[in-house]
Design a protein with these regions (language model features):
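Active-site histidine-anchored catalytic micro-motif
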Residues: 5, 9-11, 18, 78-85, ...
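Internal, active-site/partner-interface "lid" segment
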Residues: 186-215
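Low-complexity, highly charged intrinsically disordered N-terminal segments
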Residues: 52-80, 84-92
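Extended hydrophobic packing segments that form well-structured cores
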Residues: 45, 64, 275, 392-496
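Glycine-rich phosphate/diphosphate-binding loops that line cofactor/substrate pockets in enzymes
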Residues: 1, 56-60, 64, 90-100, ...
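Short, solvent-exposed amphipathic alpha-helical segments in soluble enzyme
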Residues: 21-23, 120, 268-272, 321-333, ...
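Hard-cation-handling environments
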Residues: 205-418, 422-426
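N-terminal amphipathic/basic leader segments beginning at the initiator methionine
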Residues: 1-57
Length: 496
């Protein structure tokens, strides 16, 4: 029977956000040491659950070390990295001689105060420990589809396995697939990884797996895998555009049991497919006026109009409190609006006033100067809750980050004749309708729903929508990447 060392270190880092991500952010999302890494993940629908369920079903002994995850946000404070490395490497030093494999749940786009490549740094240190002890142990890592993959990650791992769907409905499945690869490696199978970075940095709105260019590149990768039994797997990684690092961008990775030259030729083919469909990866967005004009021209039908605000894409790291769309929308005088804003200060005011109270609030745009200005909203406090909810889509994009139970902190619902607004104390990406349903809000019955996302909302919201329009606003997850003050993307392409 096999013994596997297990750890998780997951964060998607936005270089342009002013607030750093400290240890407290991990403790607020997932911070599990030792046996808690099993107890708090097994059965929760996350990638960790996928690995653990597979490992235990095969009778492996799992040695849990530390599993940490935080919501996308600013650069990670070095203290958090030290805590992870201290716990993990103490366990590795102690257990190295008895383990048959190492399994890691990573993101692939983690940046700290002092490292542009946290995952590469961790993997290199693992390799150094194993080499010092004269051990050959396979190291398998799960990556997010939005990973910015470095050569160091590839050189210091045995096999990397990335999500294939965006929204990330296959995150748990990917960990299962990676665990099966680890089983093969522990049984003596050899693979070589071939990595191919590209110069293309695509915004999140341009990398949904059901649209070009991802659709064609992913389909071509699956055809290659099916045709060549030497190929263990091909990763198509869209990259995460808001990490200002040299390795930012679209990349490809092939794990092969056969000749490296053939694997490299396959990656050349995939780059050609990407380039043939590249224009769709830089989508154009509407002004609010244009979106409303198009919405007004639609025939009558059931379901709301989705007004997508990718520049305040909570799943991409932004604060979730931008008012650049909601404010002007309210100013039009339209009604039937549903929106969610992260505003703990406003939640406390609602709690103090109590359910049923009439209240005037200044909501939104309090975290930084990049996401509009606070707007005045007068209405009735309809609901106050602890903000906890269960996901309705158990394999949703959100489950890939936190499992199937969510906590948006103390929350309040305020309403007037124009809008119903959910106010939260913790930012929560709109990836599951349970977020609104749990608070008594029915987006299905709205005329307009403001959605702070890029692609990750689609599995939840598209089925209820009459139409969907992407609206260009000024936030730090803008799809117009040339607006951002990059310093390290030498030779990269940010637009058509």
């Amino acid at each position: 029977l096999k013994t596997v060392l297990f750890a998780g270190l997951y964060h998607e880092t936005h270089s342009f956000l002013s607030d750093p991500t400290g240890l407290a952010a991990f403790k607020a999302t997932a911070f599990n040491v030792g046996e808690a890494a099993i107890a708090n993940n097994l059965g929760n629908g996350s990638p960790s659950d996928g690995f653990l369920s597979t490992a235990l079903s095969r009778g492996w002994t799992v040695l849990p070390t530390i599993q940490m995850a935080a919501m996308p946000s600013g650069p990670v404070e070095d203290e958090a990295i030290r805590v992870f490395e201290g716990t993990f490497f103490e366990a590795l030093e102690r257990e190295a001689e008895r383990i048959d494999g190492i399994f890691l749940i990573l993101h692939g786009a983690m940046v700290s105060e002092t490292s542009d490549d946290v995952e590469g740094q961790v993997l290199a240190r693992i390799r150094a420990v194993l080499e010092r002890k004269g051990l050959v142990v396979p190291v398998v890592g799960v990556l997010d589809l939005h990973a910015n993959v470095s050569q160091a990650m590839v050189d210091n791992s045995t096999l990397l396995c990335a999500y294939r769907e965006n929204p990330h409905t296959d995150a748990r499945e990917t960990a299962v697939r990676a665990a099966i690869h680890l089983e093969e490696l522990m049984s003596g199978t050899d693979v070589v990884q071939v990595h191919r970075p590209t110069r293309y940095v695509l915004p999140p709105t341009g990398v949904g797996s059901m649209k070009e260019p991802m659709r064609s590149v992913l389909a071509a990768a699956r055809r290659i895998e099916a045709a060549d039994p030497d190929i263990a797997g091909i990763n198509v990684m869209a990259g995460y555009a808001y990490s200002d690092i040299a390795d930012c961008g679209f990349s490809l990775n092939c794990s092969t049991r056969g000749p490296v030259a053939i694997a490299s030729a396959y990656l050349d083919e995939l780059v050609e497919v990407l380039e043939a469909n590249l224009a769709a990866g830089y989508p154009q967005e509407n002004t609010l006026d244009e979106a409303l004009r198009q919405a007004d021209a639609l025939p009558d039908g059931a379901g709301p109009i989705l007004l997508i605000e990718p520049a305040d894409n909570i799943g991409g790291g932004t604060p979730g409190d931008a008012t650049d769309l909601l404010g002007p929308l309210l100013a039009t005088g339209r009604s039937g609006i549903v929106a969610a804003l992260n505003d703990p200060e406003a939640v406390e005011e609602c709690r103090a006033a109590g359910i049923g109270s009439e209240i005037t609030l200044r909501i939104g745009a309090k975290v930084d100067r990049h996401h509009g200005a606070p707007i005045t909203f007068s209405g009735r406090v309809r609901n106050i809750t602890d903000g906890r909810f269960e996901l309705e889509l158990k394999n949703s994009h959100l489950a890939s980050m936190i499992g199937t139970s969510a906590d948006m902190g103390a929350s309040a619902v305020v309403e007037n004749e124009q809008a119903v607004i959910l106010l939260t104390s913790k930012k929560m990406p709109p990836m599951d309708l349970g977020q609104l349903h749990s608070q008594g809000v029915r987006p299905e019955e709205a005329r307009y729903v403001v959605v702070k996302a890029a692609v990750s909302h689609k599995d939840a919201y598209d089925p209820i929508a009459r139409a969907s329009f992407y609206v260009d606003t000024a936030g730090l997850c803008t799809s117009n990447l040339v607006r951002l003050p990059y310093r390290k993307l030498t030779g990269k392409r940010l637009s058509l």
